[in-house]
Every structure is written in C-alpha cells, then in structure tokens.
Amino acid sequence: MMDKKKLHIAAGVICDKHNNVFIAQRPLKSHMGGFWEFPGGKLEDNETPEQALLRELQEEIGIDVTQCTLLDTVAHDFPDRHITLSFFLVTEWKNELTEKKGSCRVGHLLCL
C-alpha cells in the first residue's frame, strides 16, 4: 500500500466589519475543482501556518493581513491524501480583496 500524500493547509475566514465572509470557488481543473472554500494554501518548508496564511492571502486575493486569530486545526483523510487544515479568523487587512488570475474562479462576500 502506498503512503498518502500529506498536506498542511492554512485557510482564512475573512470577516469584514459588516459580518460578511469571503469565500472563493476553486479552479475547475484543480483538486476538488468547482467547490467553494475559504482562501489559503499549502505550507512551504519551515513555514508556520500563520506565515503561510499571510503569504497565500497576499498571493491569491491581494490583501495584507494585519489581524488574524487561529480558530481551529482539523485533519481529514481523503482517498489519496491526508490534509491538516488550520483555520484563522481574519478581521483586519490592508488593500482591497482582488481575485488574482488562476487562484480562484470567483470570490464572494456573503452576509451571515
């Protein structure tokens, strides 16, 4: 039996002052393409989950996070991989939310 690929992902639950939450749709050709998710990405070597979150949100949606708090870390086994997800509540940032080409199909602020 082959070992499953192991990934650690940092994701941001981006909540504005009006309690709107930003979600993004995964590119159709990616793993789980078309699904909706909180933006973020994989940790690089020697990177903490918070460092990965800050880097990924800048790369994917153009924001510089100034305030975030770890909400929870959960693990899930898919048939082909083991994923650890670290979720952060993001409440303050600089710059406007901008969908960068290739990072997501579309993003939306949803009212809770």
Curated annotation (Swiss-Prot):
Keywords: DNA damage, DNA repair, DNA replication, Hydrolase, Magnesium, Metal-binding, Mutator protein. Its cofactor is Mg(2+). It is an enzyme of class 3 (hydrolase). CDD domains: NUDIX_MutT_NudA_like (cd03425). InterPro entries: Mutator_MutT (IPR003561), MutT-like (IPR047127), MutY_C (IPR029119), Nudix_hydrolase (IPR020476), NUDIX_hydrolase-like_dom_sf (IPR015797), NUDIX_hydrolase_CS (IPR020084), NUDIX_hydrolase_dom (IPR000086). The keyword Zinc does not apply. It catalyses: 8-oxo-dGTP + H2O = 8-oxo-dGMP + diphosphate + H(+); 8-oxo-GTP + H2O = 8-oxo-GMP + diphosphate + H(+). Mg(2+) binds at G40, E60. Residues 6-112 form the Nudix hydrolase domain. Its EC number is 3.6.1.55. A motif (Nudix box) lies at residues 41-62. One of its GO terms (biological process) is DNA replication. One of its GO terms (molecular function) is 8-oxo-7,8-dihydroguanosine triphosphate pyrophosphatase activity. Specifically hydrolyzes both 8-oxo-deoxyguanosine triphosphate (8-oxo-dGTP) and 8-oxo-guanosine triphosphate (8-oxo-GTP) to the related monophosphates, thereby cleaning up the nucleotide pools and preventing misincorporation of 8-oxoGua into DNA and RNA. It prevents replicational errors by removing an oxidatively damaged form of guanine (8-oxo-dGTP) from DNA and the nucleotide pool. 8-oxo-dGTP can be inserted opposite dA and dC residues of template DNA with almost equal efficiency thus leading to A.T to G.C transversions. Belongs to the Nudix hydrolase family. This is 8-oxo-dGTP diphosphatase. The gene is mutT.
